[in-house]
């Protein structure tokens, strides 16, 4: 009887973990479904901001992410990835809700800080949950697919592309409606995060956890040169990507390109990234990570 009960309970857990994968994919989709990003510069200009103030806003956003990237990862390890997802999703929704009422530089700075906090909490938490979920299912012999990370990248980039098309169309109609739709998409992250379960993963004892951040920083700064370079490269790459993105939009506007075409152009580059994510896994599997990065 106990064996039957144990088998039944194990089946329930497996079903929840399998459902986890789809929920994480869905959450990643709506988190990346940023319909406002392809027209963010014209949107800020419509609020009366100069180009210098717009870049100041992006500096605030990028700085928030860089400062909180490591602490948010430690928070997720300490309190659980699901907790980080839930809090990040709530903050994400609040941020875009506040954007509906932001009309000056100060309120937009507050918005950038809020969404920067949410991006730090959500960044990596979905990936870690997906990895732990698939690792558990592989150990139990119920899944043998190692392409989950590649699929996650493909879904995120595809969401950016689809969001860009919708954002370009809505921007022609009304920025106010665009922001409302963006807020609704943001709150979808919380709805999906509520269904996610925490997969089992190795966690250090409570006594060690208090020393964990010091040991992690020491290992990062002194122990592993490759890891140190990766940690430095990731935020620098993100910052460079942000600034190129914000520079392109004023250039497009100066060339007389319509807002609807902003969405088409942004969608095109997002689809290229999606395809690279899709096939990058095979390149890495066959030739190694160093070759793929090169």
Could you say what each language-model-derived stretch is?
Residues 90-103:
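C-terminal ends and interior cores of transmembrane alpha-helices
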Residues 14-67, 225-267:
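Helix-loop boundary and gating motifs at the non-cytosolic
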Residues 113-157:
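Cytoplasmic helix-loop-helix junction between adjacent transmembrane helices
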Residues 177-195:
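Symmetry-related core transmembrane helices of the 12-TM Major Facilitator Superfamily/SLC fold
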Residues 7-18, 197-232:
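Juxtamembrane intracellular "pre-TM" segments in multi-pass secondary transporters
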